[in-house]
């Protein structure tokens, strides 16, 4: 069963605010997972709002495939956040080996192109990366867009929050829209 919550705030808030919306809805949860989209990011992403942010979960081989693909197409990585996960064995989560959130600079030839051309590039790139990782089950690309972070996982939402330390309000991961 799906539960939906949303927060839009004038000041940046941590994911725990959205997670608290789920607490009254826990009865009957089937452990099918948790998805979170954050927009208007602050914290570790505050200086990269105009840079496309790639959100992915993958194997080590998937990381290498993404690295090679992005380099071949002229994307330059400018920032990265890799969550420090809690790997307790009792957590009900179907975790991937790697979770990566990277900001990139556009390829040189796209830096002066129209907004529409850059948006088309990001959409096409996400779809190509998705197909590349799916080919040998090396992972999932959730989003590739400026100032948007997407995190998804299968399992108990409370355990997923513990795994990604989303209950910690350390200021590193905040947004105005969750």
Predicted regions span which residues?
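N-terminal segments that mediate ammonia production and transfer
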Residues: 1-178
């Amino acid at each position: 069963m799906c539960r939906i919550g949303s927060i839009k705030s004038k000041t940046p808030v941590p994911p725990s605010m959205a997670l608290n919306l789920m607490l009254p809805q826990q009865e009957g949860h089937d452990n099918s997972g948790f998805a979170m989209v954050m927009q208007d990011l602050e914290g570790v992403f505050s200086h990269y709002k105009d840079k496309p942010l790639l959100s992915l979960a993958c194997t080590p081989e998937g990381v290498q495939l993404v690295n090679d693909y992005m380099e071949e197409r002229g994307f330059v990585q400018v920032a990265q956040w890799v969550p420090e996960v809690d790997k307790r064995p009792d957590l009900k989560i179907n975790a991937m080996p790697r979770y990566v959130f990277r900001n990139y600079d556009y390829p040189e030839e796209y830096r002066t192109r129209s907004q529409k051309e850059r948006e088309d590039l990001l959409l096409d790139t996400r779809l190509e990366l998705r197909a590349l990782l799916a080919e040998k089950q090396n992972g999932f690309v959730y989003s590739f867009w400026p100032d948007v972070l997407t995190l998804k996982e299968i399992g108990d939402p409370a355990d997923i929050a513990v795994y990604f330390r989303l209950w910690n309000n350390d200021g590193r991961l905040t947004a105005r829209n969750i």
